[in-house]
């Protein structure tokens, strides 16, 4: 497994407000708090602060809260969507899940963890692309996956 990309000295960052201009996701499904660095059309590094107040912890699992794996994958997909949708020609489009390949869950993510989300776009043919993604907590890999996405026009 490759080490994650590091944040550059002169990073391109996005606050939560700026992120909301690119991604359509809103509470409770906005799973990236901010972007630490990104290169449009190539890669993005996001941050998610996992709090005990997240609604999914009420049922997964009350006595031993663990962030659901599908939500980790969604957070990675949203990070990749930042890279794809930050290109001027993709402004206002949606990035939809097309598939998940080779997902591996390596570490549980629990309340108090800070996720560093990495997604690198490795292929794109027309509106369909592939991203290699990983999420890290305290320097340890929590999940890796290859994600397929499709870009589409957003409804007005």
Name these PLM-found stretches:
Residues 35, 66-90:
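Active-site helix/loop of acyl-thioester processing domains in fatty-acid/polyketide metabolism
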């Amino acid at each position: 497994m490759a080490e994650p990309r590091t944040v550059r000295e002169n990073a391109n960052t996005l606050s939560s407000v700026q992120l909301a201009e690119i991604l359509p996701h809103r509470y409770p499904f906005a799973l990236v708090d901010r972007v630490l660095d990104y290169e449009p059309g190539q890669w993005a590094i996001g941050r998610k602060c996992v709090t005990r107040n997240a609604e999914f912890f009420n049922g997964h699992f009350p006595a031993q809260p663990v962030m659901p794996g599908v939500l980790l994958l969604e957070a990675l997909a949203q990070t990749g969507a930042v890279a794809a949708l930050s290109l001027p020609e993709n402004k206002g489009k949606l990035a939809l899940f097309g598939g998940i390949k080779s997902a591996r869950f390596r570490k549980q993510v629990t309340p108090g963890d800070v996720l560093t989300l990495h997604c690198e776009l490795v292929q794109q043919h027309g509106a369909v692309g592939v991203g290699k993604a990983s999420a890290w907590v305290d320097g340890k890999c929590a999940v890796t996956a290859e994600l397929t996405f499709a870009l589409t026009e957003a409804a007005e």
